[in-house]
């Protein structure tokens, strides 16, 4: 099963178009999409952190607050579609990762303090578009670090199109080239 984490706010989003092409090429017939803009995601606060920590310490992961983590863990492949805005991804993606990340469920630490992820996925695709230059250090690299170091996903792949809104550039042509260059 492919999990598509859709963090595209705009209708006809260029990032969404590119991400859906990646999903089509992967070819798995089962796709679960979570559109972050249609969910009531909230950043972790004092109460939610305390609740999560208490339940995790008791080994009780039946609360709905763990549903996003369970869905993420059970996926065979993950595709994240997130535009590059204001030198990063939309803050809603960070909020989603906060809601997914739970020590004891999605990641466990060994006696030396080394995290070991429990995710089933072997690969995560990070798909993005940018109106100007795309800077992976401020978006993809953070996601890559979290999922490889703490979630146990061994491979990530960046697919992006940049400079789509630069005067004199042809955004349709840029997107076509990015689509043609997709390798899985």
Identify the role of each PLM range.
Residues 109-151:
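Short, glycine-/small-residue-rich phosphate/pyrophosphate-handling segment
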Residues 4, 80, 124-126, 158:
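Structural beta-sheet core signal
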Residues 36, 129, 161-163:
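Active-site donor-binding loop signature of nucleotide-sugar glycosyltransferases
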Residues 1, 30, 122-124, 155:
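Residues at the starts of beta-strands that form the adenosine-phosphate
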Residues 8-12, 131-134, 164-166:
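Short histidine/acidic/glycine/proline-rich micro-motifs that form metal-
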Residues 73, 91, 119, 151-154:
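Structured loop/turn residues at beta-strand edges in well-structured enzyme cores
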Residues 1-98, 102, 180-184:
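N-terminal beta1-alpha1-beta2 submodule of the flavodoxin-like/Rossmannoid cofactor-binding fold
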Residues 137, 141-184:
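Glycine-rich phosphate/pyrophosphate-binding loop and the adjoining helix
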